[in-house]
A protein has these predicted regions:
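Membrane-embedded and juxtamembrane structural elements of multi-pass membrane proteins
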Residues: 53-56, 88-112, 125
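Short, aliphatic-rich beta-strand segments
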Residues: 60-65
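Catalytic zinc-binding patch centered on the HExxH motif and its immediate surroundings
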Residues: 42-59
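Catalytic Zn2+-binding segment of zinc metalloproteases
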Residues: 67-68, 72-76, 84-100, 128-129
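Short, functionally critical alpha-helical segments immediately adjacent to catalytic or ligand/cofactor-binding
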Residues: 42-44, 78-82
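Intrinsic structural disorder
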Residues: 49, 53-54, 80-81, 103-106, ...
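Active-site His/Glu-centered metal-binding helix of metallohydrolases
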Residues: 81-90, 115, 119
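C-terminal capping/extension segments of zinc metalloprotease domains
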Residues: 1-24, 31-43, 68-69, 74, ...
Length: 215
């Protein structure tokens, strides 16, 4: 059962409401998905930093104040936190299996970003949040560098297209009953992703299993 989107009305400069909210969302995702690995969630009230990061060594997920400013509801914040939880899980797997390290991540960072995006969609759905918020928050905060080669992350347009395809394939009910259809950031995604969505339509039409090369 999806939780109705709740607007963020917090003043994280005056009290601990931001910390309480981030912890609540984080532990809700952990518990709903039966994730046994230990991790903690912190807020750094720096409004100039629009980001969330995972510190592999300490399994700390840090949400910066700027991200709270850009997040319009709990769905969007949950999408980002779920993405970082995926990275934290991989850090645990590395300690236990000996294959994951910052060096490994630095060699194939885009692979881990795509993996974290898809797993985050699963996590938020299981926790009762709307996965389409992943598209709206990413469209707001993730820049589109001119050259992907020199970036540690895939192009935002490709990440958005891959997330949309994953939701379309695995959770189509969220597109049928789309509570974000009138959201200006979702509308902008529809505008800017037309070519990529046509590629997806062609794949579905031909019942193809090939991976789409998104733009």
């Amino acid at each position: 059962i999806a939780i109705p989107s709740q607007a963020l009305t917090i003043d994280y400069t005056k009290d601990g409401s931001a910390q309480a909210l981030v912890s609540k969302i984080g532990f809700n995702i952990l518990n709903a998905n039966r994730i046994p690995q230990r991790m903690v969630f912190y807020v750094k009230p720096d409004k100039k930093v629009v980001n969330a990061v995972t510190y592999f060594r300490d399994r700390q997920i840090v949400v910066y104040g700027g991200l709270l400013t850009y997040s319009d509801n709990e769905d969007e914040l949950a999408a980002v936190i779920a993405h970082e939880i995926s990275h934290a899980i991989d850090s645990y797997d590395g300690v236990l299996r000996g294959f994951f390290s910052p060096v490994t991540y630095s060699l194939k960072p885009k692979k881990y970003e795509y993996k974290a995006d898809k797993r985050a969609v699963d996590f938020v759905v299981k926790a009762g949040y709307n996965p389409l918020a992943f598209i709206t928050i990413m469209n707001k905060i993730d820049s589109q560098p001119r050259y992907e080669l020199f970036s540690t992350h895939p192009l935002c347009s490709r990440r958005l297209a891959a997330v949309y395809e994953y939701i379309y394939t695995k959770y189509p009910q969220y597109l049928v009953q789309n509570e974000y259809k009138d959201n200006i950031y979702y509308q902008n995604f529809l505008l800017t992703s037309r070519e990529n969505r046509l590629k997806l339509q062609e794949k579905v039409k031909n019942n193809s299993k090939k991976r789409i090369k998104y733009l």
